[in-house]
Regions:
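Extended, subdomain-level signal for the structured scaffold at the beginning of enzyme domains
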Residues: 20-22, 27-142, 146, 155-166, ...
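Compositionally biased, intrinsically disordered low-complexity segments enriched in Pro/Arg/Gln/His
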Residues: 13-15
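Catalytic nucleophile serine of serine hydrolases
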Residues: 150
């Protein structure tokens, strides 16, 4: 079966063997206290990655995606339109990825967790899509664990799910998130119950570590 994330032609970042796509070596992290227990296994956990069809910051999609795959989970790419997603590296076009499921057809009960990558254009476009906002709201109502990074929290404000929450983000979102009822903190990664948030691509090692732990803990408790 073809994996849902595309092959890449950048040998220094991805490797393609006889079996097709093979994930990069594990992400190096900056913490000596990384959890390596069985609770971090995501076997059987289906994780929705929700992005716009254009504008997602590539690393904020691919690195959590790889972390979920390495832990045994099943990442699934959702977008408003079928076809492909155009990733960016800041302002430059990067790789494309095939959409697995249109968010129009997606329901929270079909997934065990949600990841919202960043990218300014991605987040701005996504918050204007009614089905994307509906899906995010459903995930919170169903108490699904959620990971969000950089500009990703914009859609959380649109979905009206931030009242009483504490999270971090790209600094320019601070006022928007506080106006939506959240407490904003400037931290590499912040965990508020089953909501994991980080500020920027430099925070990805910590973000991926906590995301896998929180997703696995939630799956183990069901």
């Amino acid at each position: 079966m073809r994996p849902s994330f595309p092959r890449r032609n950048r040998a220094k970042r991805f490797h393609v063997g006889n079996g097709g796509y093979r994930a990069r070596p594990p992400i190096e992290t900056r913490s000596a206290s990384i959890r390596r227990t069985a609770v971090d296994e995501l076997s059987g956990v289906r994780v929705a990655f929700l992005v716009a069809n254009e504008g997602v910051e590539q690393r904020e999609l691919t690195e959590p995606w790889d972390a979920v795959r390495r832990a045994g989970g099943e990442p699934v790419l959702l977008a408003p339109e079928p076809g492909t997603v155009q990733c960016f590296e800041h302002l430059d076009r990067a790789d494309t990825a095939p959409v697995d499921v249109s968010v129009h057809d997606a329901r929270a009960e079909e997934f065990d967790a949600l990841v919202l990558p960043g990218g300014v254009a991605n987040a701005d476009e996504l918050r204007l899509d009614d089905d994307a906002v509906r899906f995010v709201r459903e995930c919170f109502e169903a108490r699904r664990p959620v990971g969000v990074i950089c500009h990703g929290p914009w859609i959380l404000a649109e979905a009206d799910v931030l009242d009483g929450r504490t999270l971090t983000s790209w600094p320019s979102l601070e006022t928007d998130l506080e106006n939506a009822g959240a407490t904003w903190v400037d931290e590499e990664v912040h965990v508020d119950g089953e909501l994991v948030s980080s500020r920027k691509p430099d925070d990805l090692p910590a973000f991926c570590r906590e995301l896998v732990h929180v997703f696995a803990s939630a799956a183990a408790s069901t």
